[in-house]
C-alpha cells in the first residue's frame, strides 16, 4: 500500500471514529447537538448567584423568578435543579451579574508551553468554562494550535466542521479586517470560541512573507493582539490556547496576553522543559519590539501526585524556591477524570449525574479545578477590571 493511500485511510477512519464518539455521547455529530444537561441544586445555584437559597425561594414565590422545574420522586415532588440559563436569569433579577467596566479592556489570559501533555488545553478549557459559569462573557481563542483540541471539547471538530476559512488564518494572512467571521457559539451561555484546524499551521510558513509583501496591518507578532482588539468589546475575559511550540504563532500569543500561564508538571524533566521554554522565549524576543505588550507570567503546577513515592511534593518545593511568587498557590492534581472527560467530550463542569464515573470521583475532580480557576479569577482577572 502506498503512503498516500495509507494516510487517506487513516484520516477517513479517524474522522469516522470521531463522529461515532460524538453520536454515542450526543446522538448527533453536529456542534449544535452539544448540550449541558447538568442541573445545579438550589444551594449550588445560590452560591453562583451570590444570594441565599431562601432569597431564591422567596423570589419564586413572589413571581420575580419562574416557578422551579419539579419532578415526582416516589410520592414527593422535588426540584430537579437549575440550568445555567436559569442561573444567569437569577443573576439578572438579583443584580449580581459580574461585568467589566465599559472603558476597561477585557483581560487576555494566554496558556502556553512548548511541549504537549502538560494539561495546557485542559487548563484553557476548564478556565473558560468556569468563567462562563460565573456569568461572564468569554471568548476562547485557538490562537495558533492546529490540533484544535479546545474546539473538539465544544463540538467543533477540526477538518470536519472547521476549515481554513473558519479559523484565524485569513486574518493572520491579511485577508480579513476583523475576526467576527471566525467566532462560533458553544453550548455554554456566554462562551464563544474561535476554533482551529490543521490549516492554521500555515502561519508558521506564510506570515512573515505576507508582512514582507506589505499585506499585514501591523507587525507579524502583533497580529493576534490586533485580532482580539476587533472583538474585545463583546467580552469580559478572553482566554487563548496556544500550540506546544515556539513559532511565530506562540510569539503572537505571548504578545496578545496580559497574563501568560505556563502549565508545568511537578516533575524534574518537565521543570527543565519549562526552563527551556523561558530560555528560548527570551532569545526569540530579544530583537522584537513588543510595543508595550508584555504579559505577567505565572506558573501553574499540573499533574501533581500525592501518591507514595511521588516526586511532586519535592519538585513543588524546588519550583517554588526557584520561581517564588510566579507560582500559583493551587495545583492541578493528577486525576483520571481529565482523560475520561475527553472521551465524554465534557469537562467536570458540564457533567450531569448520569455522565460521571462516580459521585466521589467527580467531586474530587471538581475540588481540583474550582480552586485553580478561582485563584486565576481572583488574582489575575479581577484586579484588571472593575466589577459593578
From Swiss-Prot:
CDD domains: ParAB_family. Keywords: Plasmid, Plasmid partition. The keyword Transcription does not apply. One of its GO terms (biological process) is plasmid partitioning. InterPro entries: AAA_dom, DNA_Partitioning_ATPase, P-loop_NTPase. It holds the Pfam family AAA_31. It comes from the Bacteria. This protein is essential for plasmid partition. It ensures the proper distribution of newly replicated plasmids to daughter cells during cell division. SopA is trans-acting. Belongs to the ParA family. This is Protein SopA. It comes from Escherichia coli O157:H7.
Amino acid at each position: 500500500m502506498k503512503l498516500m493511500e495509507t494516510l487517506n485511510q487513516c484520516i477517513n477512519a479517524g474522522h469516522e471514529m470521531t463522529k461515532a464518539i460524538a453520536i454515542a455521547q450526543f446522538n448527533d455529530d453536529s456542534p449544535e447537538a452539544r448540550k449541558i444537561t447538568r442541573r445545579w441544586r438550589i444551594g449550588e445555584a445560590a452560591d453562583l448567584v451570590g444570594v441565599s437559597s431562601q432569597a431564591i425561594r422567596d423570589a419564586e414565590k413572589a413571581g420575580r423568578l419562574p416557578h422551579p422545574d419539579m419532578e415526582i420522586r416516589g410520592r414527593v415532588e422535588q426540584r430537579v435543579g437549575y440550568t445555567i440559563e436559569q442561573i444567569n436569569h437569577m443573576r439578572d433579577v438579583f443584580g449580581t451579574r459580574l461585568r467589566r467596566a465599559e472603558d476597561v479592556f477585557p483581560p487576555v489570559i494566554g496558556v502556553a508551553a512548548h511541549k504537549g501533555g502538560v494539561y495546557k488545553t485542559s487548563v484553557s478549557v476548564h478556565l473558560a468554562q468556569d468563567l462562563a459559569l460565573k456569568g461572564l462573557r468569554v471568548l476562547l481563542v485557538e490562537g495558533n494550535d492546529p490540533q484544535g483540541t479546545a474546539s473538539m471539547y465544544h463540538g467543533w471538530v477540526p477538518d470536519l466542521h472547521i476549515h481554513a476559512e473558519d479559523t484565524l488564518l485569513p486574518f493572520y494572512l491579511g485577508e480579513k479586517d476583523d475576526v467576527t467571521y471566525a467566532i462560533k457559539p458553544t453550548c455554554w451561555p456566554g462562551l464563544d470560541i474561535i476554533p482551529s484546524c490543521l490549516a492554521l499551521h500555515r502561519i508558521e510558513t506564510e506570515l512573515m512573507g505576507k508582512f514582507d509583501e506589505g499585506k499585514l496591518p501591523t507587525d507579524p507578532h502583533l497580529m493576534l493582539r490586533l485580532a482580539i482588539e476587533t472583538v474585545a468589546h463583546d467580552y469580559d475575559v478572553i482566554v487563548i490556547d496556544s500550540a506546544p511550540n515556539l513559532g511565530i504563532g506562540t510569539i503572537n500569543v505571548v504578545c496578545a496576553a496580559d497574563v501568560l500561564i505556563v502549565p508545568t508538571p511537578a516533575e524534574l524533566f518537565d521543570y527543565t522543559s519549562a526552563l527551556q521554554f523561558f530560555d528560548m522565549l527570551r532569545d526569540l524576543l530579544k530583537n522584537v519590539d513588543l510595543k508595550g505588550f508584555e504579559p505577567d507570567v505565572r506558573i501553574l503546577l499540573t499533574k501533581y501526585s500525592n501518591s507514595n513515592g511521588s516526586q511532586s511534593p519535592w519538585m513543588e518545593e524546588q519550583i517554588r524556591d526557584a520561581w517564588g511568587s510566579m507560582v500559583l498557590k493551587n495545583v492541578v492534581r493528577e486525576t483520571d477524570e481529565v482523560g475520561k472527560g475527553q472521551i465524554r467530550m465534557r469537562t467536570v463542569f458540564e457533567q450531569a449525574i448520569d455522565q460521571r464515573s462516580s459521585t466521589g470521583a467527580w467531586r474530587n475532580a471538581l475540588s481540583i479545578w474550582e480552586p485553580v480557576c478561582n485563584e486565576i479569577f481572583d488574582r489575575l482577572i479581577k484586579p484588571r477590571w472593575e466589577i459593578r
